UniProtKB/Swiss-Prot annotation:
Broad class of enzyme this protein falls into: hydrolase
Keyword list, A-Z: Hydrolase, Nucleotide metabolism, Nucleotide-binding
Pfam hit, one: DCD
UniProt family annotation: Belongs to the dCTP deaminase family.
Protein name in UniProt: dCTP deaminase
Residues forming the catalytic site: E137 (proton donor/acceptor)
Catalytic activity: dCTP + H2O + H(+) = dUTP + NH4(+)
Subunit field text: Homotrimer.
Organism annotation: Acidovorax ebreus (strain TPSY) (Diaphorobacter sp. (strain TPSY))
Pathway terms, separated by semicolons: Pyrimidine metabolism; dUMP biosynthesis; dUMP from dCTP (dUTP route): step 1/2
UniProt binding sites for dCTP: K111, S112, T113, Y114, A115, R116, T135, L136, E137, Q156, Y170, Q180
């Protein structure tokens, strides 16, 4: 299994629609102002956070149960940025829609700009033949409110190509998050 380069990422995005919308370079400024970078890097792709957020609140719940998750545990918010309460988290989705090839698995890591501020970005791997918008989780590990920005980079996706195609892909087994479009809550 080998990590894939910027050339491979560009080819797969442009010829096979693996990432839409796709940025072939690295964007560091927008309208003359510095932003958290996004787009193609040497061996990965820096994804952006969209304007849709679900901010966790403990007003209605006493226990967080992944098998029986209460949608009232979140407050929906839309904007150019989101403030995450201290020691809490928010969900968002990517601007980009992904179509992962059958012989590829991705690993997604948070950007150091956020990590250095105590904001951890968590995303599970994108499995072979998974497609959809990625649901992102931002954890504020600090005792202060934390700000995250829509339309700017938040995490980097690394693409690994297997030596052969898998016998059963995410699509083959009808994975529960296949084709997700908005910020998707846990499904047991």
């Amino acid at each position: 299994m080998s990590i894939k380069s910027d050339k491979w990422i560009r080819r797969m995005a442009e010829q096979h629609g693996m990432i839409e919308p796709f940025e072939p370079g690295q964007i560091r400024q927008q309208d003359g102002r510095k932003i958290i970078s996004y787009g193609t890097s040497s061996y990965g792709y820096d994804i952006r956070c969209a304007r849709e957020f679900k901010v966790f609140t403990n007003i209605h719940s006493t226990v967080v149960d992944p098998k029986n998750f209460d949608e009232k545990s979140f407050v929906d918010f839309e904007g150019d940025y989101c403030i995450i309460p201290p020691n809490s988290f928010a969900l968002a989705r990517t601007v980009e829609y992904f179509r992962i090839p059958r012989d590829v698995l991705t690993v997604c890591l948070g950007k150091s700009t956020y990590a250095r501020c105590g904001i951890i970005v968590n995303v599970t791997p994108f499995e072979p033949e998974w497609e959809g918008y990625v649901t992102l989780e931002f954890s504020n590990t600090t005792p202060l409110p934390a700000k995250i920005y829509a339309g700017e980079g938040c995490a980097q996706v690394l693409f690994f190509q297997g030596d052969e195609e898998c016998a059963v892909s995410y699509k083959d087994r009808n994975g529960k998050y296949q084709g997700q479009h908005g910020v998707t809550l846990p499904k047991a």
